[in-house]
Amino acid sequence: MQYLEAKIEDLTDIISLLQDDILGKTRESITKDDFSAYKKAFLAIKKDLNNRLIVVKENDKIIATMQLTIIPYLTFAGGKRLQIEAVRVHSSHRAKGLGQKMIAWAVSFAKKKSCHLVQLTSNKERKEAISFYEKCGFKASHEGFKLYLK
């Protein structure tokens, strides 16, 4: 299994993984117009040195993805935290330990980048994901809020 930075040619497979989700199936699509928006976002992520879009490959096939963002902050006398986003594992590879390996890989990445903590959020509708993150050692220590602008 390989953990690699995503390339533009991986984008269609990444979008498919985003769709293969309780919420993604209604909000993600690969129409021509949508693909242009995904491509623009992908290129912006790649340009940002604090962002990594990771794909997990097995036998040259993408089976999982996640986005990692290093966030510098002033509190605690300054430091960095790693934000984990958009963790998706192909349905045929779920419940086989891959998600735990991905989180361990992300935590190792955070340590190499001298981050003080790793954080993530999960939609409250994703009960299984919340349970999974708790099993990985994450604590529900904060209440998150979002304000959608579009």
What are these language model-derived features?
Residues 2-16:
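A short beta-loop-alpha structural element at the N-terminal edge
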Residues 8-9, 19-26, 33-79, 148:
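Acetyl-CoA-dependent GNAT
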Residues 54, 63-68, 82, 87, ...:
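Conserved GNAT-family N-acetyltransferase fold
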Residues 73-84, 94, 141:
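A conserved beta-turn-beta hairpin within the catalytic core of GNAT-like acetyltransferases
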Residues 86-89, 95-108, 135:
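Conserved acetyl-CoA-binding loop-helix of GNAT-fold acetyltransferases
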Residues 90, 123:
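Residue-level recognition of the GNAT/N-acetyltransferase active site
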Residues 100, 116, 124-142, 147:
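Conserved active-site alpha-helix within GNAT-family acetyltransferase domains
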Residues 103, 110-122:
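Conserved GNAT acetyl-CoA-binding A-motif
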